[in-house]
Amino acid sequence: MSSDAARTPLLPTEKIDTMAQDFNLNSRTSSSRKRRLRRSRSAPRGDCMYNDDVKIDEPPPHPSKIPMFSDLNPNLRRVIMFLALYLTIGTLCFYLVRDQISGHKTSGVVDALYFCIVTMTTVGYGDLVPNSSASRLLACAFVFSGMVLVGHLLSRAADYLVEKQEALLVRAFHLRQSFGPTDILKELHTNKLRYKCYATCLVLVVLFIVGTIFLVMVEKMPVISAFYCVCSTVTTLGYGDKSFNSEAGRLFAVFWILTSSICLAQFFLYVAELNTENKQRALVKWVLTRRITNNDLEAADLDEDGVVGAAEFIVYKLKEMGKIDEKDISGIMDEFEQLDYDESGTLTTSDIVLAQTTSQIQR
C-alpha cells in the first residue's frame, strides 16, 4: 500500500501536462521579452516615449528638395540681406549728393552704385571723388561699414560658392576612375582645403580673363592696359590711371569688382589654412607612427587602474595630436555626470528620462 502511494503522483497527469504547456509558453514569452530588451539599439528612445509632444532627432530634409535660397546657410542669407540693404542705402545717399562728387560721370544711379562698390571694396580709383564736407563724411562712414560687410562676405559667400565646385573638381581629377557619391564625399573630407584652393584659383582665373576681355572689348583698352587694370582692381590698389569709364563698364564693375576682390582674399586665406593643415597632418602622422612608451601608458591611464582601455588610448592620442585638450574632456565629463542620474557610471534610458524630468521641474 505504501509503495503504491509513493508511486501515485500528487497531481493528475492532465494537470501536469497543462502546467508544462503554461511553463513553456511563459518561458518563450519571457525569452522573447529578453530578446526585445537586448535590441536596445533599434528600440525607440526613452525621451520620445516620455514626451510625445517633443520631436527629437527628426532628419533634416534633403538639400535637393529645398528651394535654392532656403538651401543657403542662414548666416549667408543674413549677410546677403545686409549687402542688399547696404547697397540700397549707399546708392540712395550717393545719388542725393551726386552734385558734390566730381569726376567723369555717366548715369546718376549707375555712378552712385559704382561709387558705393568702389568705396566698400577700398579700390578707390579716383575717377569719382567727393569734393564737399558732407560727401566726404558720408564716404568715411560707408568705407568702414563696407569693410566690415566685406569681411563677413569673405567668410560666408566665398565658402558657399567654392563648395559648389568641389565635387566637380574631384570628378575632373579622377575622370578615368568610377567615382560614386560616397567616394566623392570621402575625397572631399580628406582634401577639403586643397580642393577649395583649386576651386578658388579656377574661379579667380576665370574672373581675370572675363575682366580683361571686357575691358578690351567695351572700354577699348589695349590688352596690357586691361590686364594692368584688372590686377590693380582685384588687389584693391586702384591707382586710378585705368578704370571703368562707360555706363556699361561701371554696371559690369558693380558685380565684377565685388566678386573678384573677395575671391582673391579668400584664395590667400585658403592657402594659409592649407599650410596650417599640412603641419597638423605632419604632427598627426608623427604621433601615429612613434612607439608607445611606459610613460605614455601611465599618462593614458585616466582612471589609474593600471590598465589602458581603448577609450582611454583614443583620448590620449587625440590629446597628443592636438585635436582635443583637457578643457574639452572636462566639459564632456561634466555633461556625462549630469546625465548619469543614478551615478552608476553608465547612461541608460532611465537616466535620460530622469534628467529630463529634473530639468523640467527646475524650469
Curated annotation (Swiss-Prot):
Query: How would you describe this protein's topology in the membrane?
Result: Multi-pass membrane protein
Q: Which InterPro entries match?
A: 2pore_dom_K_chnl (IPR003280), EF-hand-dom_pair (IPR011992), EF_Hand_1_Ca_BS (IPR018247), K_chnl_dom (IPR013099)
Any idea which positions bind Ca(2+) 2? D340, D342, S344, T346, D351
Q: Which residues bind Ca(2+) 1?
A: D301, D303, D305, E312
Intramembrane segment ranges: 111-130, 225-244
- The EF-hand domain, residue ranges: 288-323, 327-362
Q: Which keywords does this chain's UniProt record carry? A: Calcium, Ion channel, Ion transport, Membrane, Metal-binding, Phosphoprotein, Potassium, Potassium channel, Potassium transport, Repeat, Transmembrane, Transmembrane helix, Transport, Vacuole
Which pairs of Cys residues are joined through disulfide bonds in the record? Answer: none
Q: What is its main location?
A: membrane
GO BP: cellular response to electrical stimulus; intracellular potassium ion homeostasis; potassium ion export across plasma membrane; potassium ion import across plasma membrane; regulation of seed germination; regulation of stomatal movement
Q: What are the TM regions of this chain, as residue ranges?
A: 79-99, 137-157, 198-218, 251-271
| Cellular location(s) | Vacuole membrane
Q: Name one GO molecular function term.
A: potassium channel activity
Q: What is known of its domains?
A: Each of the two pore-forming region (also called P-domain or P-loop) is enclosed by two transmembrane segments (2P/4TM) and contains the GYGD signature motif which seems to be involved in potassium selectivity. The C-terminus (328-363) is required for vacuolar targeting.
Q: What does this protein do?
A: Voltage-independent, large conductance and potassium-selective tonoplast ion channel. Regulated by cytoplasmic calcium and pH. Does not mediate slow-vacuolar (SV) ionic currents, but essential to establish VK currents. Has some permeability for Rb(+) and NH(4)(+), but none for Na(+), Cs(+) or Li(+). Involved in intracellular K(+) redistribution and/or K(+) retranslocation between different tissues.
Self-association and partners? Homodimer. Interacts with GRF1 and GRF6, but only GRF6 modulates the channel activity.
Under which name does UniProt file this protein? Two-pore potassium channel 1
Give the classification, highest ranks: Eukaryota, Viridiplantae, Streptophyta, Embryophyta, Tracheophyta
